[in-house]
Amino acid sequence: MRQTKTGILLANLGTPDAPTPEAVKRYLKQFLSDRRVVDTSRLLWWPLLRGVILPLRSPRVAKLYASVWMEDGSPLMVYSRQQQQALAQRLPDTPVALGMSYGSPSLESSVDELLAEHVDHIVVLPLYPQFSCSTVGAVWDELARILARKRSIPGISFIRDYADNHDYINALANSVRASFAKHGEPDLLLLSYHGIPQRYADEGDDYPQRCRTTTRELASALGMVPEKVMMTFQSRFGREPWLMPYTDETLKMLGEKGVGHIQVMCPGFAADCLETLEEIAEQNREVFLGAGGKKYEYIPALNATPEHIEMMANLVAAYR
């Protein structure tokens, strides 16, 4: 009996190809056209997206990307490539591909890359530790569309999330401990997760519960009392209510109340990107300090650290 050849597909959100208004506009158009991300009626959404949002937001967002752009590309792409390469080195007999829901490399090109390696089983690892229909669901949808066009379909193992995975929690905890050792233990550890519309949670998306699970497990691993760990949600978009409490409003409130030293981690981001390096490390730092806070540090994402790569290898091992 022929032995199954397995490949691994690392999936993430995506990024513009360049920090320019044109590239950002292409990326945002694809991203904000996905019904998993924005499910508003197309009759209402298309004119708003094309006539207002893209023309106004693209130049502004391009400037933000330019402020964090690295020599080899956007931070998300640089760190994602490092993750792919490190995991491939860790698993030398297993092809590892990287695909993005929006932009390039596309999920379709990554599937084709693995099929060209003659794999007959693909382990899909969306790099979203906490499930949401707007992220993991989007990967699932696109993968289904890709495979629907194939005459031969490989076996698929799809990892829904890993919010309470032991290796993941330990890697986060060690990162926090290293930051505490470097900067001193803060008055409060704030865990900021990407937000989603509250309506999505009301309709069954268990994302907030998965975020609470990670928060609880991380606090336990650190031996921290609940009063010293807070969970918030960032990056809201549009006018409808999103998951609360909001990160920026919370930081302002904490600064005004006299909390002096805060460290912020974003456990839901497997790789640093615009939302962590600019929004959290820069914008929200100014919010906290401007409200009276004294000391603020951002704890980097796990990126391609050895512990993170080992976690990925262990996570996919059960499916290989």
From Swiss-Prot:
Disulfide bonds: none annotated. It is found in: Cytoplasm. One of its GO terms (cellular component) is cytoplasm. Gene3D superfamilies: 3.40.50.1400. GO terms for biological process: heme biosynthetic process. Fe cation binds at residues 194, 275. CDD domains: Ferrochelatase_C, Ferrochelatase_N. Pfam families: Ferrochelatase. It comes from the Bacteria. It is an enzyme of class 4 (lyase). Its EC number is 4.98.1.1. Its main location: cytoplasm. It catalyses: heme b + 2 H(+) = protoporphyrin IX + Fe(2+). GO terms for molecular function: ferrochelatase activity; metal ion binding. The keyword Ion transport does not apply. InterPro entries: Ferrochelatase, Ferrochelatase_AS, Ferrochelatase_C, Ferrochelatase_N. Keywords: Cytoplasm, Heme biosynthesis, Iron, Lyase, Metal-binding, Porphyrin biosynthesis. Belongs to the ferrochelatase family. Monomer. Catalyzes the ferrous insertion into protoporphyrin IX. This is Ferrochelatase. The gene is hemH.
